């Protein structure tokens, strides 16, 4: 969250499933409101429907905040990385979802090497350009009511399942 709050020019997060905590989501909104270019590179193909739909339940809010969403089309995405201003990066096994962060006890490294961060940012930009489809606010707004309802129900189910664990208060 500190890296997102310190961002000045660009934030790029890449992961299959994006179900962030309210704190992370609000930090992304604050960054976008400051004029930071915030981009998400997310799974385009459905591997696990519940997580995929729950991630998509946030698209309306994210797009409305000016956050760009790119869905990876080349195959299943297993990257879990992020770069802030080419000076801070995270790399590891955790998606930004409650199961990765709380239940599965996955972890990410924090890297502050400018060369590494710049290279990672360039690689992500290449993937976005070559292997992704950008989701636009206008295209998303035209999705059917059933489409949107399925995503909202999936998100609520994820958080309901989380509430059955001892980790609910931590997310």
Which residues does each predicted region cover?
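PLD/PLD-like phosphodiesterase catalytic module centered on the HKD motif
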Residues: 7-13, 17-171
């Amino acid at each position: 969250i500190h890296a997102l709050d310190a961002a000045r020019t660009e934030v790029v997060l890449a992961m299959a499933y994006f179900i962030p905590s309210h704190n992370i989501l609000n930090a992304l909104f604050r960054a976008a409101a400051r004029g930071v270019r915030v981009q998400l590179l997310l799974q385009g193909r459905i591997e696990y429907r519940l997580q995929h739909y729950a991630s998509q339940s946030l698209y309306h809010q994210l797009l409305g905040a000016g956050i760009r969403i790119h869905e990876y089309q080349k195959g299943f995405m297993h990257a879990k990385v992020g770069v802030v201003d080419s000076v801070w990066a995270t790399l590891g096994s955790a998606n930004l979802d409650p199961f990765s962060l709380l239940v599965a006890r996955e972890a990410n490294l924090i890297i502050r090497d400018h060369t590494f961060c710049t290279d990672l940012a360039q690689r992500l930009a290449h993937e976005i350009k070559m292997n992704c489809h950008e989701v636009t606010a206008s295209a998303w707004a035209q999705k059917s009511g059933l489409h949107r309802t399925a995503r909202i129900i999936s998100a609520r189910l994820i958080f309901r399942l989380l509430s059955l664990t001892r980790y609910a208060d931590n997310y």
